[in-house]
């Protein structure tokens, strides 16, 4: 299990850089008695809390906390995020995030508009718009709120695409559970699995057919593009809410 949480700041001091904000969030977690012992080393963009690391491998889970700055206004973000699910306008949901590999701006830039942009709310809206589009079914079963709530109540009823993604992630976790820490870095990240599954999904009304179709077609959505900065062709999986962002950027490095 993994939980993705956005630590959203609705403003900042004018002199704060990405580094300042990232460290501020990290310090708050580090200074909390409950989180100090389970806080992992600083990640590229997130802080991670690891739960039950010494317990049963099947019961371990982690929470990724993404520091972000909202330059639009909190009320506007909420209004846009929870508006009509079929509205495919995502640009107003963009947040500015930290990235400690973007040198030197990570420790120098104080303008959030210049930082790396991310769109977790827009991505959730994109995903649910696809998941809710089941062949032969006109009634909307789920709301966007159920897809972005960080800790929703357990729901036994899920859409076929949601269940298929859960199974694919579980398969990944089991496959890599006995690998070394270095080899575990080769695991496909969750947003890659989710994106490829959603793009391959064709409105199947049951988990079996959905999973079969996704497994058969998901590879077709891995593109190849020429990266001028690396002077070579790289695998490319576009963020559907930001086509310039490559979810598979690590593949080119590794």
Feature locations, PLM:
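Flexible, surface-exposed loop/gating regions in the mature catalytic domains
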Residues: 4, 48-50, 129-133
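Catalytic metal-binding acidic patch
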Residues: 1-16, 62-66
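Amphipathic alpha-helical scaffolding segments
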Residues: 22-27, 82-85, 214-218
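Short, conserved charged micro-motifs
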Residues: 14-19, 206
């Amino acid at each position: 299990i993994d939980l993705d949480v956005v630590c959203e700041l609705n403003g900042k001091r004018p002199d704060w850089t990405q580094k300042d904000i990232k460290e501020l969030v990290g310090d708050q977690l580090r200074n909390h008695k409950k989180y100090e012992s389970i806080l992992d080393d600083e990640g590229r963009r997130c802080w991670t809390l690891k739960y039950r690391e010494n317990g049963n491998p099947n019961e371990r889970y982690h929470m990724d906390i993404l520091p972000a700055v909202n330059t639009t206004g909190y009320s506007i973000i909420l209004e846009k995020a929870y508006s009509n699910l079929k509205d495919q306008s995502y640009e107003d949901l963009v947040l500015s995030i930290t990235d400690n590999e973007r040198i030197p701006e990570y420790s120098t830039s104080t303008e959030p508009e210049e930082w790396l942009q991310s769109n977790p709310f827009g991505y959730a809206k994109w995903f649910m718009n696809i998941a809710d589009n089941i062949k032969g079914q006109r009634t909307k079963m789920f709301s966007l709120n159920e897809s972005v709530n960080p800790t929703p109540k357990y729901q036994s009823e899920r859409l076929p695409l949601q269940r298929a993604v859960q199974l694919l992630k579980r398969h990944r976790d089991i496959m890599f559970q006995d690998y070394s820490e270095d080899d575990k870095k080769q695991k496909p990240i969750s947003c890659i699995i989710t994106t490829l599954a959603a793009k391959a999904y064709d409105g199947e009304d049951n988990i079996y057919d959905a999973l079969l179709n996704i497994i058969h077609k998901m590879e077709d959505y891995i593109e190849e593009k020429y990266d001028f900065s690396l002077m070579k062709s790289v695998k490319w999986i576009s963020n559907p809410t930001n086509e310039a962002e490559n979810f598979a950027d690590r593949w080119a490095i590794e």
